[in-house]
Amino acid sequence: MKTGIVVRVARQAGLVALFVATALVGTASGVLFAYADDLPQISALDDYRPNTITRLLARDGQTIGEFATERREVIGYDEIAPALRNAIIATEDAGFNQHFGLSVSRIVITALKDIFTGQRAGASTITQQLARDLFLRQYMREGGAFERSLERKVKEWIVAVQIEKRYTKPDILRFYANQIYLGHGAYGVEAAAHLYFDKPAKDLAPEEAATIAAIIQAPERLSPFVDGRRALMRRNYVLQRMEEEGYLTADQSRAAQERALVLQGQPTQERSIAPYFVEDIRKTLEQKYGAKALYEAGLQVQTTLDADLQVAANEALDRGLRRIDKRRSGFRKPARNVVAEGHAIDRFTVERWKRPMLAGDIVPAVVMAVPAKGASGTARLRIGTRELDLPAPAFAWTRRTSPADLFKVGDLVDVEVRTVKDGGPETLALEQAPIIEGALLAIDNRTGQIRAMVGGYSFTRSKFNRATQAHRQMGSAFKPIVYTAAIDRGFTPVSIFVDEPVSYTAGPNQPPYQPLNYDRKFEGPVTLRRALEQSRNIPAVKAMQEVGPRQAVAYAARFGFPEKMMPYLSLALGAAEATLVEVTSAYSAFPNQGVRMTPYSVNTIADREGNILEENRPEAHEAIRADTAFVMTNLLRGVVQRGTATAAAKLDWPLAGKTGTMDEYTDAWFVGFDPNITVGVWVGYDEKKPLGNGETGAAASLPIWIDFMKAYIDTRADRKNPPRFEPPGNIVFVTLDSGITEAFINGTQPQGVAVVQTAAPASD
């Protein structure tokens, strides 16, 4: 009896299945011709070119920037680890290697479930998923009605079969593996392998391959960065499926399942080491090639940036701005209190705590406890799961002895990690983000290539690039241009200017122009060298008068400065505005025998196949004669050895440069060079307000420049045998009574003195 019932039920189920299959096949046949003309051309896969990442590379090949709508790296079939190929097939389509694009049995089972239980189940093969993702999404919108859903499904079947007829199974799996979305902006298995495990897809271990295959079903829910427990369960399910399908032995599957889920990547893209530099290039690329090419075409951009120097520039500017901020502004109350914001203080977390920490890193910390008001002692701070003491020496710069005078429980403060232990912070020092701004730019003298660029304290805080966009008054940093014009007109380093009170007619209904020196004193007769080294204002104005303001403006234009400068005597003291890149580029002509190279940041741009679209080469402009340039270089060396920049002399390296300070200390500059590189530093507020009394170029900008140059010198292979400023053949050297060995253009040296040598001295 029971056997008969079972037979009848089985027969009825079989008839239903046969009916459903017949109906589906009939429906498919009926609509095939109706839809055929409306379907995409499958041959488009012959030239499979999905959206890929545009990459910016430093000189050493390090990636410094990426732009993409879909973060994808296209790879070949052989670059996909066999374990990953097997994991995908075992999980997504076990019959992949046998079917012709459709799995009729899965279609029937799915249809029956839908009809009899109302449960929707996935029946799509890998080929169907590929058809849907590559072609059909752009041809139709998803509809809620059954008829609309059936129409979409039939088109999907047709396209899947066409794909199977045209391409091999390895081709189809390659297309699929490069196309699928795998969470956090990563498309394709190569991008996912780097995202989750920081390695290429070809090097994935079975448990890593299973993790990636596990994500395909629901990337937003199954990402191990989102839910580690769920991701682990799903990974182990994939490993079990691989065992069931014969891709792993039971022992291999068990061993892989027992391994912890260890992630090596980052859930978000790491910040660029050169965000201002990268953004500058991004704007140029978008303007030249268009947004579509920038974000989808996978351009490969080889830049001029030196990654090591860029890191040094970041650190030097950060340290310098923090130093100035502490001495000028003091401690500012924390802007955030997590308790006041409604957070549970024990559970509050920040993204930065999830990343590794090294000594010197600046990280946020939450204040967990402070002593009573007015009582000295230590504060208790938390970083991640670690609670650490902040002793009095760690906040001594605030000039407060009680932590309660500085902050309260729940405040979020910045701290510097002084030492680390067991992968986490051990000792801390209180820090704060400076409100002052600055910029640093380094240019290769012989090519004009930009080696490092920092456009401000924080790109997150402000994307305004103070290295290229901020027009600021130059102060005394403009004086070398004036003195260069004077030397070209016959002046020499020993020409005399009288440093004395002066008054010039400024024009109708204008008060007379009466420049003063920084110290409000006058030295009487001084040499041009002395005037430049000590940055005396009156001699510079007199040199401008001798040259002629209009001629000085014309000279400035030869150095790359804007021609719109007004020809006033105050120009000698830097009243005109310029950008840091303009000033730094101008100075680079001095050590380069008078030739200024146009600054540039991109060497080559190639398409995804490596075809060169653009190649930039150095562009030279002869600013001044080589002999004049060398005399100025020798004079500017004196600024470092005896003048306003003597702090740099301790570097024991051939250096030259000039400080610059504007009235009321609104702008502080130092621009200097060695035989190979020119580096400019500017410090100030975005709004033109004083930095504070005494914040000159020597006090504010020079220490930043020195920090950077220390790191630069350490990178040089010739640091034990420094390069030299090589003189042209018509330069002669004369040792003066002062003991200085002075450089002269032959024929301009003082009469009756002996020429001591015709090669550059090792030092003055």
Predicted segment positions?
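Short, well-structured active-site flanking segments
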Residues: N97-I107, Y187-E190, T249-Q252, E426, ...
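A penicillin-recognizing enzyme superfamily signal
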Residues: T303, A307-R319, G342-G360, P364-A442, ...
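Active-site SXXK
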Residues: I88, M242, A313, T447-G448, ...
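N-terminal type II signal-anchor transmembrane helix
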Residues: M1-L57, G95, I115, I324
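Non-catalytic structural connector segments
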Residues: T249-M357, L516, R520
